[in-house]
Amino acid sequence: MQKDALNNVHITDEQVLMTPEQLKAAFPLSLQQEAQIADSRKTISDIIAGRDPRLLVVCGPCSIHDPETALEYARRFKALAAEVSDSLYLVMRVYFEKPRTTVGWKGLINDPHMDGSFDVEAGLQIARKLLLELVNMGLPLATEALDPNSPQYLGDLFSWSAIGARTTESQTHREMASGLSMPVGFKNGTDGSLATAINAMRAAAQPHRFVGINQAGQVALLQTQGNPDGHVILRGGKAPNYSPADVAQCEKEMEQAGLRPSLMVDCSHGNSNKDYRRQPAVAESVVAQIKDGNRSIIGCLLYTSDAADDR
């Protein structure tokens, strides 16, 4: 690493990581698994477009910190998914990266041993191995697209992705979303702004050119065709925004932007005032609105973990 008066002044070290194609060669998908993931992505796309009448439910722990616990959760999740499959399409939330307002543990990929060692290469390997086991169980998987390089390593294993409230306004993440090979939900801003998510959805639907990495780990100019499967996620802000009036306002703003209203409700975060025990009340409101004839709500997000796990 070159370090002098002008270069890398605030960088203390660098480590070259394995490339995406090396990781995939070590932990490959089978043809059957590829077909399964493609099918689940199509199902979610059909739900977003209104071609499938079921409700999309993305559910799981706030973040993954222990693979064995995640597998035990997945076994229960699979049984529930089969039980409700006529009316609900359950997708397991498997988040490895945690956005932080200031500092804190950034997730299993960044610090898999949770000891400040930041063994990212081990984190990528642990994450891909776990995802393959979950896919092998027949589960569709969801994540938050946070680091722009992570999708090259793990994106082929996911069926749905979210762009979080802190990153929805980021041009980098809008460009990345335009190239993701799966449906993407955009959360409203932390202040509750709908325009942030709606503008992100519009931007991601368009073609983009941006600098990223390819499967060989080379820096490359990537060109996208745009992602047609975007939708808004209402996650609350300074106040909850899941009421019928809030949903109607979102529908209105999406229509004014030339978009077909399609939205999910995040039952946590600002909509539950960050109290996990309030999630059922939010979900009940979503169900009531759908029973009353709402057709723009395509799903909801639920968070399940060990009580008030706030990692």
What are these regions (language model features)?
Residues 2-8, 87-242, 246-247, 270, ...:
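Active-site-facing alpha/beta catalytic cores
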Residues 65-81, 118-126:
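Glycine-rich anion/phosphate-binding loops
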Residues 60, 265:
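Conserved, mostly hydrophobic/aromatic
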Residues 14-48:
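N- or domain-start disorder-to-order transition segments that initiate the globular core
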Residues 49, 82, 134-136, 255-258:
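Acidic (Asp/Glu)-rich catalytic clusters
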Residues 296-302:
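Thiamine diphosphate
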Residues 303-310:
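Conserved small/polar residues in nucleotide/adenosyl-binding loops
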Residues 37, 41, 64-65, 70, ...:
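Metallocofactor- and cofactor-centric catalytic cores in central/energy metabolism, strongly enriched
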